[in-house]
Amino acid sequence: MNPILRDILDLLDVERIEENLYRGRNAAESEHVFGGQVLAQAIASAYRTIGDARDLHSIHAYFLRPGDWNAPILYQVDRIRDGKSFTTRRIAAIQHGRAIFSMSSSWQKHEVGLEHSVPMPDVPGPESLRSDKEAYVELAKIRPEVKRFAYRFDAIDSRQVENILMMAPSNVARPPQKHTWLKTRDPLPDDPEVHLCMLAYMSDLDFMSTSLLPHGRSPGGDRNNFQGASLDHALWFHRPFRADEWLLFAKSSPSASGARGFVRGQFFNERGELIATAAQECLIRVRE
């Protein structure tokens, strides 16, 4: 396994402090706390109180305050309910005595029922597309600051169908949709917790920027007059999946108003099955 992927997996793991209390750390090479990391660490903390007897089917999270990358994050798990079919956990992420993040999660016992799935978008497969790693290496030659984002693509093979990079300057209005193929660069352990956490991590990669496409803006092109941040994040897990196999992340933004953008995305496996759905509201504040 390549060292960057190993580091990310270690980062997404949490340390048990005592019953219902866990500790996560931050990446030394990143000068911000990535939302996908906090999502994954919160899921890992809840998972430790449940195990693999139940399937995670949904999370609903709020980002309350910016995180401090120089301090560990404590995760307090509240065991709201342990029912016959469903289990509920509420998780608070705490730094310096204040909550920076809260999440509710629901878990279901294994059941079989009715099935259907919307069709996967008709887009080129990943084999014909350029890796984001290659594109970011070139961009970093003129924008060294993007290296703090690019290191993730040493671990995650990400390929854009429309070839739109989040950190690349843009002044061209585009339709509010993007399609990205994603998977880890190396095989992962079979542990379901690892795949849940990795998908949560990947679901926050280049998601918010979809809401900027119709306005000819990008986080990379508006560094001095644009403020962006995730406000909330939701995930629904529909079917079993592996994060080390190709997944298509089909993203769209149906609305932006009131300095907030709304984005949603669907994850499909290569067989065309819908395996997860994501949604997020984000701050997209333009400074005049």
Where are these predicted regions, by residue range?
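Terminal targeting signals and extreme-terminal segments of soluble enzymes
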Residues: 1-288
